[in-house]
Regions:
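Charged, flexible boundary elements
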Residues: 101-111, 288-314
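Noncatalytic, basic helical substrate-engagement surface that gates or grips nucleic-acid strands
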Residues: 1-129, 133-155, 159, 233-236, ...
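Non-catalytic nucleic-acid-binding/docking modules located in mid-to-C-terminal regions
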Residues: 48-53, 98, 121, 141-144, ...
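A residue-level signal for conserved active-site and pocket-lining positions in enzyme catalytic cores
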Residues: 7, 54, 112, 132, ...
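Short, intrinsically disordered, charge-balanced linker/junction segments flanking boundaries
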Residues: 330-331, 337-346
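Conserved small/polar residues in nucleotide/adenosyl-binding loops
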Residues: 348-355
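Gly/Thr-rich phosphate-binding beta-strand-loop-beta motif of the actin/hexokinase/Hsp70
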Residues: 314-334
Length: 359
C-alpha cells in the first residue's frame, strides 16, 4: 500500500510562480492549472501509488490562528489570477477520481500529517508531495517527503534529512522553535539564528532538554540571556510549528484509492482550458470532436419539433446557449430531414464550460 499525499495549496502556488501567466481564448488563467498537473503526473509516475489524496486549506481560521492572532498575519492574500484557478484544479482532480481532503480549523499540513500517520500505522508507505519544508518533520522509515523546488524535486528520507541537518527529522520542530519562521510569522527566540539553533538542537535535541540543562550547558553569556528571555516565545513557537496528527478526516486508507475517471467531463473542461497535451496524456479526445462524431439522440421524423423542444431543450432555449448538431455541423435550429428516418439533436450549455448531451 502506497499513498501519495499532496499539499494542494503549496503545489498550486509553486506551479503558479513557476510558469508565466497563461490564459485560454476566453481570458481564463491556466498557468497554475497546467503546472499543477505537470507536477502531479511527474510525481505520480515516479512514486506509482495505489492511493492518492490532495489536501487543501480552507479560508476559515485554524486553531493556530484562533490561539495566536499574529500567526501568518504577515501573509499576503492569494493573487486573483491564482485564486481563479483553485476551483478549476479541484474540479479536474474530482473528474480524475482523486480524493480531495479539507477540514475546517486545520491546515493542509495537518491533514498530510494525519494521513501519513494513519497510512504508516497501517503498515503502508506514504509519500508527501509539497513545496513546504514544514512537512520534513514527518519523515520517518515509512514516510518520505518529496520537496518540489524550482529546479528539482528533492526526496527526503531519514538518511537524507540527517545528512543535511545533522539531527533526526522530528527535531525540526525544535529548530524552528529557536530560530523561528518568518514566512509563518513564528517568532522563535529573538537573536538566535539558524546556525546557533542548529548547534543547540544537535546537542540537546529538544528545547525541553535544552532548558532543563541550560544552567550547566556552558553557553556564551549572550546566547544564555537570549534563551532565558525568549523561553516563552520558544515554547509558543514549538506549539505553532508542530503538525497535528489527529485531524478528524476519513481514516480508512482504502477510501483514497483512485476512483473511476469521468472522461466526458474531463474532455469538456480540458477542451475549454485548451490543454490538448494534457488530454493526449490522459488518452481522451476534445469534446468538439466527440460531439460531432457521436449521435446523441435519434428521433423519429414523425415526432413534432415542439415536443423535442419541451423534452430536451427546456429553459436552455431562453439562454441562447443551444445549438443543434447534424453530421458534424451546427445549426441555430433543428433541421427536418425528409429524406432520412431520423434527425440528430444535441445542445451546448456554454455557461457551465461543458458540452452536455441528453441521451
Amino acid at each position: 500500500m502506497k499513498l501519495l499525499a499532496i499539499d494542494g495549496n503549496s503545489i498550486l502556488n509553486r506551479a503558479y510562480y513557476g510558469i508565466r501567466l497563461l490564459t485560454n481564448k476566453n481570458g481564463v488563467y491556466t498557468n497554475a492549472v497546467l503546472g499543477f498537473m505537470n507536477i502531479y503526473f511527474k510525481n505520480f509516475e515516479e512514486v506509482k501509488p495505489d492511493r492518492v489524496a490532495v489536501a487543501f486549506d480552507l479560508k476559515a481560521p485554524t486553531f493556530r490562528h484562533k490561539a495566536v492572532d499574529t500567526y501568518k498575519a504577515n501573509r499576503k492574500g492569494m493573487p486573483e489570477e491564482l485564486a481563479q484557478q483553485l476551483p478549476i484544479v479541484k474540479e479536474l482532480l474530482t473528474y480524475m477520481g482523486i480524493r480531495i481532503v479539507e477540514c475546517e480549523g486545520y491546515e493542509a499540513d495537518d491533514i498530510l500529517g494525519t494521513l501519513s500517520k494513519v497510512c504508516s500505522d497501517s503498515g503502508g508507505e506514504c509519500c508527501i508531495l509539497t513545496g513546504d519544508r514544514d512537512s520534513l518533520q514527518l519523515v520517518n522509515d515509512r514516510v518520505t517527503v518529496r520537496l518540489a523546488t524550482t529546479k528539482e524535486t528533492i526526496v527526503y528520507t531519514p538518511e537524507r534529512f540527517i545528512e543535511e541537518y545533522g539531527f533526526e527529522p522530528i527535531y525540526l520542530i525544535d529548530l524552528k522553535s529557536l530560530m523561528g519562521d518568518s514566512s509563518d510569522n513564528i517568532p522563535g527566540v529573538a537573536g538566535v539564528g539558524q546556525k546557533t539553533a542548529g548547534a543547540l538542537i544537535k546537542r540537546w535535541k529538544t528545547i525541553e532538554s535544552l532548558y532543563e540543562n541550560i544552567d550547566g550547558a556552558e553557553l556564551s553569556k549572550g546566547v544564555y540571556n537570549k534563551l532565558i528571555n525568549g523561553r516563552e516565545d520558544a515554547i509558543r513557537s514549538k506549539w505553532l510549528a508542530t503538525i497535528c496528527l489527529d485531524v478528524p478526516v476519513d481514516y480508512d486508507i482504502e477510501n483514497y484509492k483512485i476512483s473511476e475517471r469521468n472522461d466526458e467531463k474531463l474532455s469538456d473542461l480540458l477542451t475549454e482550458l485548451e490543454m490538448a497535451k494534457l488530454m493526449q496524456k490522459l488518452g481522451i479526445e476534445p469534446s468538439e470532436k466527440r460531439a460531432s462524431e457521436k449521435t446523441v439522440r435519434a428521433v423519429d421524423v414523425k415526432t413534432q419539433l415542439k415536443d423535442i423542444d419541451e423534452e430536451i431543450l427546456g429553459g436552455f432555449l431562453k439562454m441562447n446557449s443551444i445549438c443543434y448538431l447534424f453530421d458534424g455541423k451546427a445549426f441555430k435550429s433543428a433541421q427536418r430531414l425528409d429524406d432520412e428516418n431520423f434527425i440528430t439533436v444535441s445542445y451546448t450549455h456554454l455557461r457551465a464550460h461543458e458540452t452536455r448531451r441528453h441521451l
